A protein has these predicted regions:
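A glycine-/small-polar-enriched, mobile loop at the entrance of the PLP active site in fold-type I
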Residues: 7-26, 33-35
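PLP-dependent class I/II
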Residues: 1-6, 34-326
């Protein structure tokens, strides 16, 4: 269905609309309402992006941040939040609590729920406090919600949900991607939505920078956000892999923390992550060292649910065939 939409729109020699087609913006708006409970979103407050990673990496720059500005991100986090701040010349600040930020100004706060790599879900109350804190100070809050349709033991909530932000999207940006929910990483298809004034600023700069999503990809996005059945099917596959890997990791002797949503299992053997990486590698299982995601992750490893069913089953068999850590 998505590939068919891409093919049907492939004869597109002209420049695409940086703002996105009206059909795409309508499809995204309907999805945000239908799946995430977002209300009152301005149709012009939706902007397609070339995947979500380029937006994450460029957002501080696009917002005009630079030397002397602070960009806050989770202590254990996707590295591009840090890199994006550095690209702009701003200061990246890893912090999980608002009190640690002190009285100085903050230009941008990143939240990520469900989180990569931890799979942690932030409760509504926490998100609401972040929004209230930021609005008092004129700080932009950007919420990376790429895994939001992959809730397992907890259901994530969007920063744009009225329980979080009330009746206003002022100061808020939600970032989304088709890479995870629709398994379309190769299409480089995502969007940002929220505060219409902020989105308008981003649109103006992106037009001049040539940051536009190709027309065939916009057509594919329109189809993907209009269909829920393929997402449900993909969720079922991830859920089955998660069940298999959870049991295998526990049998091996690792403790799985958070991991209540998203595509990853965040595990620890209560030792330096590189020792855990080496032990698992000796069994033929490759994992990501938690240190890659910040100093606070140096005793954890990340396992992804993105391998094929056959590879996940093989990894589980290897984990349960070796002596445990206990």
């Amino acid at each position: 269905m998505v590939a068919a939409a891409l093919r049907a729109a492939s004869d597109a020699p002209g420049y695409p609309l940086t703002a996105g087609t009206p059909q795409l913006r309508a499809s995204i708006g309907a999805w945000l309402s239908r799946r995430l409970g977002v209300r009152g979103l301005d149709p012009d407050a939706v902007l397609p992006t070339i995947g979500s990673k380029e937006l994450v990496g460029l957002l501080p720059t696009l917002l005009g941040l630079g030397p002397g500005d602070r960009v806050v991100h989770p202590e254990v986090a996707y590295p591009t939040y840090d890199i994006g701040a550095r690209i702009a010349g701003a200061e990246p600040v890893p912090a999980d609590g608002l009190t640690a930020l002190g009285p100085g100004p903050v230009g941008l706060i990143w939240v990520n729920s469900p989180a990569n790599p931890t799979g942690r879900v932030l409760p509504v109350e926490h998100l609401r406090k972040v929004v209230e804190w930021a609005r008092v100070r004129g700080t932009v809050v950007a919420s990376d919600e790429c895994y939001i349709e992959l809730g397992w033991d907890e259901q994530p909530v969007s920063i744009l949900h009225p329980d979080v932000c009330g009746d206003s999207h002022t100061g808020l940006l939600a970032v989304h991607s088709l890479s995870k929910r629709s398994n379309l990483a190769g299409y480089r298809a995502g969007f940002v939505a929220g505060d219409p004034d902020l989105v308008s600023r981003l649109l103006t700069i992106r037009r001049h920078a040539g940051l536009m999503v190709p027309a065939p990809v916009q057509a594919a996005m329109t189809a993907a956000y209009g269909d829920d059945s393929h997402v449900i099917e993909q969720r079922e596959r991830y859920a089955a892999r998660r069940t298999v890997l959870l049991a295998a990791l526990r049998a091996y002797g690792l403790r799985v923390e958070h991991s209540t949503a998203g595509l990853y299992l965040w595990a620890t053997g209560d030792e330096d992550c590189w020792l855990t990486v080496a032990g698992l590698a000796a069994s033929g299982v490759l994992v990501g060292p938690g240190e890659f995601y910040g100093r606070a992750g140096r005793r954890h490893v990340r396992l992804a649910l993105t391998a094929t069913d056959e590879r996940v089953a093989a990894a589980a068999a290897r984990l349960t065939a070796v002596p445990t850590l206990d």
